[in-house]
Amino acid sequence: MYDFFMTWLLPFLIIVGKTLLLLVVLLVLVAYLLYADRKIWAAVQLRRGPNVVGPWGLLQSFADLIKFVVKEPIIPAGANKGVFLLAPFVSATLALSTWAVIPVSEGWEVAKINVGLLYILAISSLEVYGVIMGGWASNSKYPFLGALRSAAQMVSYEVSIGFVLVTVILISGSLDLTTIVLKQGQGLGTTLGLPFNSFLDWNWLVLFPMFIIFFISALAETNRPPFDLVEAESELVAGHMVEYSSTPYMLFFLGEYVAIVLMCALTTILFLGGWLPPLDVWWLNWIPGVIWFVLKVCFVFFWFAIVKAFVPRYRYDQLMRLGWKVFLPLSLAMVVITAAFLKFTNFV
C-alpha cells in the first residue's frame, strides 16, 4: 500500500494540485490583463474605461463572468447542436492545455518534458479546429466565413512562427523551454566582456529580426488587431462567434485570451530571458523568478494592447501578402544565416 501511494497516488495528486493552481493563477491573470487591455484602449480614446465594479473597476472582469454564466445559451434552429456546444469547449481546453509545459520559473511547470516547444506548436495548431467547428455548426454564412478566415490566417503565420522557433532551437541547442531560458546567458553582453550578465544576453538582441517577426506573427496567430479579420466588426460582426451567447461565448473568449497570454509567455521565454532578472546582481536575484516572468508577460501584453489601440486593421489580401511574401522568405533566410553562422563560429 505504501509503495502504491508513493509510486502512483502521490505523483498523481501532485500533478492535480499543480494543474489546479496553474488554472486559478492563469484565469486571474487573464481577468486582470483583460481589464488592463480595456483600460489602455480607453486611455487612448480619452475615456475612463471600467470604473464601476469594485475599486477602480478591478472586479469588472468577474462581473462579466457572472453575467455570461447566468444568461441563457441560445442555440440557432438550424445549428448542429452537438458540434455547436462542443466547439467552445475544444477551443478553451486546447488553449489551457498548452500551459502544461510553460515554466514560470526554474522547475515551476506542471509537466517537465524535453520537447516542450514541439508540444506547444502541436497543440496550438489544433486550436483552429474549435473555431472551424463553431463556424460550421452555426449554419450561418458569417460564422462560416470567419472560421475559414481563421484557418487560412493561422496556417499562414504558423509557418513563419515555426521558422522562428527553429532559429531559437539552433541558438539554444534544445527543445526544452527551461534550457532555452538558461542558455540566454551567452549573448552579446558576455561577448563584450561585461562584468555581469544582463538583458543584452537575451535572444531579443541576437535574433532581433526574428523577434519582430515572432511578435507580429503572434498578433496574427491570436487574431489580435490589426489582424482581427476573423471577427471584423465592420463586416463579419463577431466572426465565428456571431451565433454564440452565454457560457459558450465566454469559453471562446477565454480560449482567445489564454492563447494571447500564451504568446506573451512564449515571447518572454524565447527572447526576453524568461524568469531571469535584467541584470545579474544580488539585489535583483533576490526577487523570485516567477515575479520577473509575470512582469515580462505583462510588458509584452502592454505592447499587444498598444498595437490594438494605434494600428488600423489590415485588408485580407495585405494579411496574406505579409505572411507569405514577406515573413516566410525572411524567416527562412534567417534560419539559413543562423545555421551558417553557428557552423563557422564558436558563438554557442
UniProtKB/Swiss-Prot annotation:
Compartment(s) where it occurs, according to its Swiss-Prot or TrEMBL record: Cell inner membrane
A Pfam family (short name) is NADHdh
Q: What class of enzyme is it?
A: translocase
Q: Which domain of life is it from?
A: Bacteria
Q: Name one GO molecular function term.
A: quinone binding
Q: So what does this thing catalyse?
A: a quinone + NADH + 5 H(+)(in) = a quinol + NAD(+) + 4 H(+)(out)
Claim: Transmembrane helix is one of the keywords in the record: yes
Write down the InterPro entries for this protein, in alphabetical order. Answer: NADH_UbQ_OxRdtase_su1/FPO (IPR001694), NADH_UbQ_OxRdtase_su1_CS (IPR018086)
Recorded topology in the membrane: Multi-pass membrane protein
Predominantly, its location class is membrane
The entry's family comment says:
Belongs to the complex I subunit 1 family.
What this chain does, per the entry, is described as: NDH-1 shuttles electrons from NADH, via FMN and iron-sulfur (Fe-S) centers, to quinones in the respiratory chain. The immediate electron acceptor for the enzyme in this species is believed to be ubiquinone. Couples the redox reaction to proton translocation (for every two electrons transferred, four hydrogen ions are translocated across the cytoplasmic membrane), and thus conserves the redox energy in a proton gradient. This subunit may bind ubiquinone.
PANTHER family given in the database record = NADH DEHYDROGENASE SUBUNIT 1, NADH-UBIQUINONE OXIDOREDUCTASE CHAIN 1
NCBIfam families documented for this protein: PRK06076.1-2, PRK06076.1-6
Subunit relationships: NDH-1 is composed of 14 different subunits. Subunits NuoA, H, J, K, L, M, N constitute the membrane sector of the complex.
Q: What is this protein called?
A: NADH-quinone oxidoreductase subunit H
Please report the organism this UniProt entry assigns to the protein.
Bartonella tribocorum (strain CIP 105476 / IBS 506)
